[in-house]
Amino acid sequence: MRISQLEGKAVALWGWAREGRAAYRALRQQLPAQPLTVFCNAEEARDVAALADPALQVQTEASAQALAAFEVVIKSPGISPYREEARAAAAQGARFIGGTALWFAEHAQPDGYVPGAICVTGTKGKSTTTALLAHLLRADGHRTALVGNIGQPLLEVLSPQPPPAYWAIELSSYQTGEVGRSGARPELALVLNLFPEHLDWHGSEAAYVRDKLALVTDGRPRIALLNAADPHLAQLQLPESEVRWFNHPDGWHLRGDVVYRGQQPIFDTANVPLPGEHNRRNLCAVLAAVEALGLDAAALAPAALTFRPLPNRLQWLGSVDGIAYVNDSISTTPHASLAALACFAQQRVALLVGGHDRGLDWQEFAAHMAQQAPLEIVTMGANGPRIHALLAPLAQSAGFGLHAADDLAHAMQLARSALGAQGGVLLLSPGAPSFGVYSDYVARGRHFAQLAGFDPAAISAIPGLGVQ
């Protein structure tokens, strides 16, 4: 559905965060007098009222009955379509779409494809991978947009002039299904990995996997680039797409620190500013994507040396009294915490884990701790007691210290004390969201920096957003 097709319909916006505001502005550009209703909370309602838009109404209760009064509801990504009120309204005929679907419909060519649209998703690593892809494309002289879930809603860049040659688009699991629903098809879709995540939004692990894979199953990209090492992806059949693989010995893959293409060594990643083997494997994915676009990936690989790492992602803040502080606040799954720990093997590490409890399974994390644990683990947050109870029977035999904290400040105090005069690495990689304590993972990362004695402004915005 294109924006012009909304004219004359009963249309509502559900959510007034950045995506909701971007949708409002996009609609007003094309439909300046279209009556609209915004569903938002009371605080946001005051912001909406300040717009003084006579064709804009506000409702603060998004009940099934209220939603069902509209033909089209443009919802923000964080609002699950599986919510009871959304399901009930949909059953009564309301159509729910998101800004991602509107953007793709606006850009689709007559054959359905969106030229230059490269969609990146995965449970972890998608922001860094998308930014690295944009970095390499720009290094090759191509005007490229870095947009989507990474921090710039697609509808904020609806029609930039001149248009970019490529769109590097990060999509969360909340957005991946929108591509297929738009009827449009991206030029390339890259899926990095799949682990259980966002189960409170999706309702189950099976639904999460289904919704995530909708990017390639329903979105039908011209090229689907998949991780051959991921069991969810290795079994996919995508007859309407050209399927390519990375992390496969016949394609782009990593051996030690060296990127190979088949049997040919291409690039030594030892000096690339990307900590962790998982990031170097994702560099393989980026190079495979660049090659799939018809560009010289081998020649572009050295451009990765000038990539600027993203904040809150294994971000080294500095050292104080022999303790190095590393901010990995973006970590919201146990798998992400494990990947972070792997970057500091053989080092003295105090790991801070815990946060909002989304019901994720920490058994695999515990199994890893039984074999290869850091020196100290400090649990915190709503799911801290659950993680602590799981690890307590293992601590003595596996040889790690285990501590329970009331909050982040207390956790850092316990970690510093445990590391002692010998120092080491104090790693914030919570494996859980920040909800209930912080507005988002960025606020959590800034608080961590402040408590460590660093300027919270060091947790800066993601560089390179928008069209460059």
Curated annotation (Swiss-Prot):
Protein's UniProt name: UDP-N-acetylmuramoyl-L-alanine--L-glutamate ligase
Which Gene3D superfamilies has this protein been placed in? Answer: Mur ligase, C-terminal domain, Mur-like, catalytic domain, NAD(P)-binding Rossmann-like Domain
Its pathway is: Cell wall biogenesis; peptidoglycan biosynthesis
Quote the EC number: 6.3.2.53
Q: Where does ATP bind?
A: 122-128
Q: What GO cellular-component annotations does this UniProt entry give?
A: cytoplasm
The family database entries (Pfam families) matched by this protein are listed as: Mur_ligase_C, Mur_ligase_M
Protein role = Cell wall formation. Catalyzes the addition of L-glutamate to the nucleotide precursor UDP-N-acetylmuramoyl-L-alanine.
Q: Subcellular localization, per the record?
A: Cytoplasm
Q: Which reaction does it catalyse?
A: UDP-N-acetyl-alpha-D-muramoyl-L-alanine + L-glutamate + ATP = UDP-N-acetyl-alpha-D-muramoyl-L-alanyl-L-glutamate + ADP + phosphate + H(+)
UniProt lists the family membership as follows: Belongs to the MurCDEF family. MurD2 subfamily.
Q: Which gene encodes it?
A: murD2
Q: Which UniProt keywords apply?
A: ATP-binding, Cell cycle, Cell division, Cell shape, Cell wall biogenesis/degradation, Cytoplasm, Ligase, Nucleotide-binding, Peptidoglycan synthesis
Please give the HAMAP family that the UniProt record associates with this protein.
Answer: MurD, MurD2_subfam
Please name the source species.
Answer: Xanthomonas campestris pv. campestris (strain ATCC 33913 / DSM 3586 / NCPPB 528 / LMG 568 / P 25)
List GO BP terms, alphabetically: cell division; cell wall organization; peptidoglycan biosynthetic process; regulation of cell shape
- The enzyme's first-digit EC class, named in words, is ligase
Gene Ontology molecular-function annotations: ATP binding; tetrahydrofolylpolyglutamate synthase activity; UDP-N-acetylmuramoylalanine-D-glutamate ligase activity
